[in-house]
Regions:
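Glycine-rich nucleotide/cofactor/substrate-binding loop typically near the N-terminus or early
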Residues: 9, 29-85
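Short catalytic helix/loop segments, enriched in acidic residues and glycine
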Residues: 11-34
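Active-site glycine-rich loop that binds ribose-phosphate moieties when present
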Residues: 75, 111-137, 143-149
Length: 267
């Protein structure tokens, strides 16, 4: 949701605020533009997996009736739930840049506590992690939308994917935003064009290592209590997994434990 046009501030994406109510509509509008483009190009079905915060932000009553919505929390594969089913491509809509980089509301999973994530030694954000999981299932990333920094980041993990820049980052809390009518038109067009990339292939199943760096030492210590997770530095933990699916399950546990260990204003 942080990568939707107009979104620049915490209240824009925090459930329950007045601004969040406004941006739920804009978020749903961008999703509908994508859905329309995919069906126009010949898609036979679209599953929308809602994955921001409570994962209950999109307005089902306003969703394109040809799509179906996966909403709610505690999904085994989180943002990528559904990848294990018969899908031929994925779209990352409303994405943001990774933690530690410039970008509107940039972060990786936790808003502030994580300062960096590395997948097999390379920096990775939510897009990079999710793309690796898609690759394990042989599913290509068709389209990425968000600010200019998120789209530039996509070139590293999904070089063949189409991108739509809906706003240009000025700072973590400011952006030059394009009106929804214009971004919707571009998303619709790019989604239609991107469908030519669709097609499931043999998956790349192999072991992976993830390392996570936090902004405070006690968060790393808390995460290191998890079996198989080791504390490799004062603020960093790492773990190995036999495949990306298991790696993401372990990553989810690490972030959950770390989030619980955050203590008030001191973090």
């Amino acid at each position: 949701m942080e990568g939707v046009t107009g979104v620049t501030w915490t209240d824009d994406v925090v459930p329950g605020t007045e601004q969040w109510q406004r941006f739920r509509r804009l978020f749903t509008g961008e999703v509908n533009a994508c859905v329309e483009g995919l069906f126009t190009a010949g898609a036979t079905g679209v599953l929308v997996n809602e994955a921001h915060s409570s994962q209950r932000n999109l307005l089902l009553e306003d969703l394109d009736e040809r799509a179906v919505l996966l909403t709610g929390r505690h999904k085994p594969l989180s943002m990528m739930q559904g990848i294990e089913s018969d899908v031929d491509g994925v779209v990352f809509l409303g994405y943001h840049a990774r933690a530690g980089e410039e970008g509107v509301l940039s972060h990786t999973y936790l808003e502030n506590s994580i300062t960096g994530v590395w997948l097999d030694g390379r920096p990775a954000g939510e897009g990079g992690l999710n793309a690796a999981l898609a690759d394990e299932h042989g599913v290509p990333v068709l389209l990425v939308t968000g600010d200019d920094r998120a789209c530039a980041e996509a070139a590293d993990y999904a070089p063949s994917a189409h991108t739509v820049v809906v706003k240009e980052c000025v700072s973590r809390y400011a952006a030059i935003c394009r009106p929804p009518a214009r971004t919707a038109a571009d998303i619709r067009s790019a989604a239609a064009e991107s469908l030519r990339l669709a097609g499931r292939t043999a998956g790349d199943v192999r072991p992976h290592r993830i390392e996570v760096e936090f902004d405070a030492a006690h968060l790393a210590a808390a995460a290191a209590v998890i079996p198989t997770v080791e504390q490799v530095d004062v603020r960093r933990v790492g773990f190995d997994a036999p495949d990306m699916t298991e790696a993401m399950k372990a990553f989810k546990i690490v972030t959950t434990i770390a989030a619980r260990a955050v203590q008030g204003i001191y973090g």
